[in-house]
Design a protein with these regions (language model features):
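Short N-terminal micro-motifs specific to bacterial/archaeal maturation
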Residues: 13, 42-43, 95
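A beta-strand edge to alpha-helix "cap/lid" segment located at domain peripheries
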Residues: 53, 57-113
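Short acidic-aromatic low-complexity motifs
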Residues: 1-29
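A solvent-exposed, acidic/Ser-Thr-rich amphipathic alpha-helical stretch
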Residues: 19-21, 27-71
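Hydrophobic alpha-helical segments, principally membrane-spanning helices and signal/leader peptides
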Residues: 1-3, 13, 33, 63, ...
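General secondary-structure edge motif
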Residues: 2-3, 32, 39, 76
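Hydrophobic pocket/interface hotspot
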Residues: 10, 22-23, 30, 48, ...
Length: 113
């Protein structure tokens, strides 16, 4: 898998605010973890693309100026880490694990406080 190309497509999808485009990178049974989800949905672990769609829809609504700039891409075995900055210059990292079909099956987001 070309992780650098994935990161470029991931950044472009997020910056488009097109949920279908964003979710196109994720498997139906994806597991997503983020402390930021606690504020919007009451828990930090989401299961399935529908739950992720509901969360990200609320997140995009709450931050209409949301944008990401990829800082670095770290390659692993069947996984990667994308470090990026958002529109407020907050550093974050997302660890993505991929299934055999190239879709994200597990994702964890961490943010600078």
């Amino acid at each position: 898998m070309d992780y650098d190309a994935f990161a470029i497509a991931w950044e472009a999808a997020w910056n488009s605010h097109d949920l279908d485009r964003i979710l196109g990178h994720y498997a139906e049974d994806v597991v997503f973890r983020s402390q930021k989800a606690m504020r919007l949905v009451g828990h930090g672990e989401l299961h399935g693309k529908a739950a992720l769609c509901a969360y990200w829809s609320r997140a995009l609504e709450a931050q209409p100026d949301l944008s990401f700039i990829v800082v670095d891409v770290l390659h692993g075995h069947g996984m990667m880490v994308i470090t990026y900055r958002n529109q407020r210059d907050v550093l974050a990292a997302e660890t993505l694990r991929f299934g055999a079909d190239g879709l994200v099956v597990e994702a964890s987001a961490c943010h600078k406080p």
